[in-house]
Amino acid sequence: MPKVKRSNADIVLRLYVAGSAPNSLSAMANAKGICDTHFPARHKLEIVDMLQDPMRALADGIIVTPTLLRLLPLPVRRVIGNLSDTAQVLLTLEGK
């Protein structure tokens, strides 16, 4: 299970990307937009470049990028892809 540092945020997310690949850039922009719009002032978004930190990605079980992990609240949830389908991303993140 991914390690999570203590946070005051209601929702803690970690986005794994692969450098400046087009889908990674889209996922970063989409994740930031979703967080700012739907979870303002109550989220923590960490972006991890799998090319720079492959062992961390491996430890979290990441084999495909982009992958967004919702670390808190538990249970951990995953969304794979560029996060362009906001409704589906929100359904997964909110556990519905």
Region locations from a protein language model:
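Thioredoxin-like thiol-disulfide oxidoreductase module
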Residues: V48-V64, G95
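Ser/Thr/Gly-rich flexible loops in soluble cytosolic domains mediating phosphotransfer, phosphorylation
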Residues: L83-K96
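Local sequence-structure signature of Cys/Sec-based thiol-disulfide redox active-site neighborhoods
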Residues: R6-C35
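Conserved helix-turn-beta segment immediately C-terminal to the redox Cys motif
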Residues: G33-K44
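Short beta-strand/turn micro-motifs at beta-sheet edges
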Residues: M1-V4
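Residues at or immediately flanking beta-strands
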Residues: V12, R42-I47
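A short, hydrophobic beta-strand/beta-hairpin element that forms part of a small beta-sheet core
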Residues: T65-R77
